[in-house]
């Protein structure tokens, strides 16, 4: 489907939804209904819109400073991918409103081509999750959620920011809801010349310009007391110029367009619920070897997704949950040797939950995927949570997860390998949560064993090809701490996290590339009446960039500090000022691509 035509269809349908009803009670519709069940057994880090503004440039910056992920960014705003608990980019599932949206070509998501302000909240779940969320949910999953509120009337919000390096970020959202109907429309536009310099590295971010725009539309209508029809759409268009190292270097760029549309019919009663979802997603991208010439390569992917999630309480203590999904994945490549291809993917999952008491519960799940021309493994998960005493809660999970080969892995010419088998992992996760008054501490040790790692290796014929290769053993520790305290008009919040990841190639015994052994984050917020101040800190430990742990090529440890101050006036207006990298540290997340030194921004937001 042509993206511009899709935009016309979206706005036309949006106009048909408008209506008016009487007010009754406040409710919120959340598209990803499975996440509420996941939270019964697993620790989830939720990042809300008020925290988006601290790291508003892109999703990479937000996740870097406010989650346990390591984000590999080839220069500010350029290609970016996550490493979750020592895994590779393809072992993190991106889930949009309950739908897995990892690229069929790459098997991963480009973090900087996901519009930060396109979502109402982000949730970061560590550990295996393939039974609920499918392929790639090995290291963890990132949930990009939208919600629709009822009975709130009209509301609008504007965020506008001007920042260093010719960066401008504008976001507008408008919503209306009553008893039966809710609609929300938003748009975001970001542009940056991105021409920063790092003299210590003799680096200028030449040809670093980027821009992107997105439109989001959501609507929900209560067709009966226990039934809701909901619709969510996202349209994204972006362009990233790839940095060059010399003044006369060849300037290249990458363009991406994304369309996501989801229709959901939900029935919710006392003892059962059912959510039927129909989704269409489209991902187009083009690579330009010369920014002034036609594209050199590219691809177009289309996915048709049907998913049903049925949940039933047999007794107040015993709950069964069945999830069925069918997808048609279509793709066509340009100058990649990938022809017009299609793949059918089906899955059936069953989960049973037993609530022994209000403080003790268990869950067991099984799943079988049916991927055309690929033999898929049998998956399972076993979880439990116990709250034995007031200040302590413990949870544990044992699961098998997988990632099936991508279109590029299978069909790229030359080098694609149709004989590849899925990667599989065995995961063991634990959560120890301690609560002392206003202090909450979560400590989560974990273990993973990943087999049949898919890698591209040189061949005797002179080209690179995809193979199932070695196994990887990963163990480590995640921890999070939260403290909140109010003293009259003084409000204080601290959120911190520490991650240790030992990720070892079982053949060589060496640490995997771009997996820091240590990472720590801290966010302090203080508010007094109309005035707010925050400070962010990020420590990243030694990070190897080669397979042989060569120290000379490794990224040295670094500590980055950000701060910001804002003032709210006349109840509706907030004016803020931010300083990023206060101490002017030279740092990078990918070799040869330093990130900006000290930089500034000023912003205003208006609620009306």
Where are the predicted features?
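Short strand-turn segments of transmembrane beta-barrel domains in outer membranes
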Residues: 128-131, 141, 146-176, 187, ...
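Extracytoplasmic beta-strand/coil segments of soluble accessory domains associated
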Residues: 60-99
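Outer-membrane beta-barrel signature, preferentially recognizing the C-terminal barrel domain
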Residues: 247-268, 387, 391-393, 397-451, ...
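Short acidic/polar hinge/loop motifs at secondary-structure boundaries
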Residues: 71, 99-127
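N-terminal periplasmic "start-of-domain" segments of outer-membrane beta-barrel proteins
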Residues: 26-53, 81
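Gram-negative outer-membrane beta-barrel transporters
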Residues: 357, 447-449, 468-545, 571, ...
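C-terminal beta-signal and adjacent terminal beta-strands/loops
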Residues: 450-451, 539-546, 565-608
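Flexible loop and strand-edge segments within Gram-negative outer membrane beta-barrel domains
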Residues: 192-198, 202-214, 222-303
């Amino acid at each position: 489907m042509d993206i511009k035509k899709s935009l016309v269809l979206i706005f036309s349908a949006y106009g048909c939804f408008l209506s008016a009803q009487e007010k009754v009670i406040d409710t919120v519709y959340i598209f990803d209904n499975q996440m509420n069940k996941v939270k019964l057994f697993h620790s989830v880090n939720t990042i809300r819109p008020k925290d988006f503004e601290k790291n508003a440039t892109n999703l990479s910056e937000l996740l870097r400073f406010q989650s346990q992920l390591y984000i590999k960014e080839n220069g500010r705003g350029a290609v970016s991918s996550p490493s979750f608990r020592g895994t590779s980019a393809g072992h993190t599932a991106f889930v949009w409103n309950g739908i897995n949206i990892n690229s069929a070509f790459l098997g991963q998501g480009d973090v900087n081509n996901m519009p930060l302000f396109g979502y109402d909240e982000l949730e970061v779940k560590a550990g295996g999750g393939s039974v609920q969320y499918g392929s790639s949910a090995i290291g963890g999953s990132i949930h990009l959620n939208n919600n629709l509120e009822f009975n709130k009337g009209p509301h609008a919000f504007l965020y506008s920011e001007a920042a260093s390096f010719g960066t401008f970020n504008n976001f507008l959202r408008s919503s209306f809801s009553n008893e039966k109907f809710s609609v929300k429309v938003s748009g975001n536009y970001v542009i940056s010349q991105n021409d920063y310099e790092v003299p210590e590295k003799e680096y200028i971010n030449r040809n670093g310009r980027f821009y992107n725009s997105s439109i989001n539309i959501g609507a929900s209508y209560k067709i009966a007391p226990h039934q809701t029809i909901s619709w969510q759409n996202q349209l994204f268009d972006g362009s990233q110029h790839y940095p060059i190292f010399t003044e006369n270097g060849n300037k290249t760029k990458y363009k991406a367009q994304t369309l996501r549309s989801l229709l959901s019919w939900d029935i919710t009663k006392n003892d059962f619920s059912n959510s039927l979802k129909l989704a269409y997603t489209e991902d187009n991208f083009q690579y330009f070897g010369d920014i002034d010439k036609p594209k050199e390569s590219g691809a177009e992917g289309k996915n048709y997704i049907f998913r049903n999630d049925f949940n039933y309480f047999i007794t107040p203590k015993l709950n069964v949950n069945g999830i069925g999904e069918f997808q048609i994945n279509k793709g066509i490549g340009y100058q990649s040797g990938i022809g017009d291809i299609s793949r059918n993917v089906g899955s059936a999952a069953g989960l049973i939950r037993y609530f022994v008491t209000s403080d003790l519960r268990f869950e067991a799940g099984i799943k079988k995927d049916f991927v055309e021309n690929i033999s898929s493994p049998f998956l399972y998960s076993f979880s439990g949570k116990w709250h034995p005493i007031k200040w302590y809660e413990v949870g544990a999970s044992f699961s098998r997860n997988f990632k099936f080969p991508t279109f590029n892995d299978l069909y790229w010419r030359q080098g694609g390998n149709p004989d590849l088998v899925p990667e599989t992992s065995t995961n063991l996760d634990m959560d120890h949560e301690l609560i002392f008054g206003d202090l909450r501490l979560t400590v989560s040790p974990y273990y993973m064993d990943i087999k049949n790692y898919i890698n591209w290796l040189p061949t005797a014929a002179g080209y690179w090809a995809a193979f199932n290769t070695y196994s990887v053993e990963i163990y480590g520790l995640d921890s999070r701490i939260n403290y909140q305290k109010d003293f009259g008009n003084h409000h204080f919040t601290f959120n911190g996290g520490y991650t240790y990841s030992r990720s070892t190639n079982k053949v060589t015994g060496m640490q995997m590339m771009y997996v820091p052994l240590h990472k720590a984050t801290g966010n302090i917020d203080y508010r007094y009446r109309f005035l707010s101040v925050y400070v962010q800190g990020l420590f990243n430990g030694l990070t190897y960039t080669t397979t042989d742990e060569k120290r000379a090529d490794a990224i040295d440890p670094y500590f980055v500090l950000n701060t910001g101050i804002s003032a709210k006036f006349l109840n509706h207006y907030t004016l803020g000022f931010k300083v990023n990298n206060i101490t002017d540290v030279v740092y990078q997340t990918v070799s040869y691509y330093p990130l900006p030194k000290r930089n500034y921004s000023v912003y205003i937001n208006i609620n009306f």
